[in-house]
Swiss-Prot record:
This is Short neurotoxin 1. One of its GO terms (molecular function) is toxin activity. The keyword Repeat does not apply. Binds to muscle nicotinic acetylcholine receptor (nAChR) and inhibit acetylcholine from binding to the receptor, thereby impairing neuromuscular transmission. Belongs to the three-finger toxin family. Short-chain subfamily. Type I alpha-neurotoxin sub-subfamily. Disulfide bonds join 3-26, 20-43, 45-56, 57-62. It comes from Bungarus fasciatus (Banded krait). The lineage of its organism: Eukaryota, Metazoa, Chordata, Craniata, Vertebrata. It comes from the Eukaryota. CDD domains: TFP_snake_toxin (cd00206). Its main location: secreted. GO terms for cellular component: extracellular region.
Length: 64
């Protein structure tokens, strides 16, 4: 599986270079801070704290 791996401060999305495997989900997290909205994309589907929106998916680059 190819998941995009990016934090909001990174200028562009880049593949994770083999860190995701066939049975691993991709994830897209968003949350608000005092500086505005933040986004984090990567591999896996972690448990998150209340207030963080998490979307997990199972196809290549589905976390765009």
């Amino acid at each position: 599986r190819i998941c995009l791996n990016q934090q909001q401060s990174t200028p562009e999305d880049q593949p994770t270079n083999g860190q995701c495997y066939i049975k691993t989900d991709c994830q897209n997290k968003t949350w608000n801070t005092h500086r505005g909205s933040r986004t984090d994309r990567g591999c896996g589907c972690p448990k998150v704290k209340p207030g963080i929106n998490l979307r997990c998916c199972k196809t290549d680059k589905c976390n765009e």
